[in-house]
Amino acid sequence: HKIQTVAVEPAESPVMSGGEAGLHGIQGIGDGSKFLVDLKKVDDIMVISTEDAKSRMKQLIGTGLLVGISSGANVLASERWIEQNDPDGIVVTILCDRGERYLSCM
C-alpha cells in the first residue's frame, strides 16, 4: 500500500480545498492551517462539520478517551476516508488534544 497524507478541515471554513474562510467550532484547525501545510504533500483533504466532529468527540469520550473536537474530526475523517478509498487499508491518525480544554463545549 502507498502511504497517503490526508488533511482535515472544517466544512464551515474549507480554505485548503478552495473554499471561503468562515466561523467554525473545531479549535486548532481551519483557515490559519492553510499556511502551515505544504499542500503539495497532501494527497487528499477531508471536510468535516463542527457538528459531526463534536458528535464523534462525544462518542470517543464515551469509550474512555477524553479528547477534544479536533480529535473527533481526525477520527471521523479517518473513518470516512478508509471507507471511501481503501476499506482493507490501515489508517494512522493523531489525537492532538485533550478534552479538559473543551469541557464547556461538551
Describe these PLM feature segments:
Residues 2-69, 84, 106:
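Active-site/ligand-binding loops adjacent to catalytic centers
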Residues 8, 73-81:
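Terminal helix/beta-alpha structural elements that buttress the NAD(P)+-binding lobe
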Residues 35, 79-106:
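Phosphate-binding loop/pocket of nucleotide- and phosphate-handling active sites
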Residues 70-74, 91:
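Ser/Thr-glycine-rich phosphate-binding loops at phosphate-binding pockets of nucleotides
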